[in-house]
Amino acid sequence: MKKILLMLLLCLAVVSCGKKDEVTDEVTEASTTQAQDYGVPNPFEIVDTLDEAAKIAGFSLEAPIEYADYNSLVIQAIADDMIEVIYFDAEKTHEGLRIRKAVGTDDISGDYNEYKEENVVKVGELEVTEKGNDGNISIASWTDGTYSYSINVDEALLNADDISNLISNIK
């Protein structure tokens, strides 16, 4: 009787070990397949200067080299489409704002939140749409008929006068 029980235990051990390997193989294959399905490539190419960005985008952008305490820039471009300048503090831990320019007349802000305040104002000859809350502007967007522009404000606090002054330095 002991021999039969021992043989039965050995058979169960062999069978259960074999099953474990098959499950592991299936999980590994599923993980490999899932890894291939995720991720969208970043279309932006980070560069050192606005001139380099202009070569990639096919047009130029004039923008301030700093704004208030945000004097560390990340400049990036999408081929034949957009230039973006992101203004960080010196430690690059806080984003103040970002400026974008792209071909066309569509809204390129990428911000589709709803705000309490939305106004269309004149800055020189430009009609600028400003969106924000409590007197602080979060988004300013405009077009010159050929290019679209936007200012997305993150941690910097900008009012209408600040935005107007900033827009006058962007081309």
Question: Residue spans of the language-model regions?
Answer:
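Sec-dependent signal peptide recognition
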Residues: 2-7
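C-terminal motif of bacterial Sec signal peptides marking the signal peptidase cleavage site
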Residues: 13-16
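Bacterial signal peptide processing site
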Residues: 18-20
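Short, solvent-exposed recognition patches
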Residues: 35-137, 144
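Short helix/strand-capping connector loops at secondary-structure junctions
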Residues: 143-151
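Surface-exposed amphipathic alpha-helical segments
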Residues: 153-171
